[in-house]
A protein has these predicted regions:
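Long, contiguous binding/interaction regions
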Residues: 1-43, 47-86
Length: 86
């Protein structure tokens, strides 16, 4: 089966986010006064083949832990969907 993993990687809540602070300041300078916090992260899409949904989940989890996310300062989550017609 073919799957598409949509991976969201963000800094852990306790980690300072200087990019988020910069974006928040820029939004306020542009007149957007409602945002009170901004956190910047990464979004990735990975297409993969696997024997089952569980196997695909395990592969994506390993990818995140071993390469895609810095487990010291980042956290991740992902959505997995089967790609029809492949």
């Amino acid at each position: 089966m073919d799957y598409l993993a949509k991976i969201y990687i963000t800094l852990k809540p306790a980690v300072n986010d200087p990019q988020g602070v910069t974006v928040l300041g820029a939004l306020k300078n542009l007149g957007f006064n409602t945002p009170v916090d901004v956190r910047v992260g990464k979004y990735l899409e990975v297409s993969l083949g696997a024997e089952s949904e569980e196997a695909a989940e395990n592969q994506v989890d390993d990818m995140c832990k071993k390469l895609l996310a810095n487990m010291v300062i980042e956290q991740y989550r992902f959505d997995l969907e089967e790609v029809p017609g492949h």
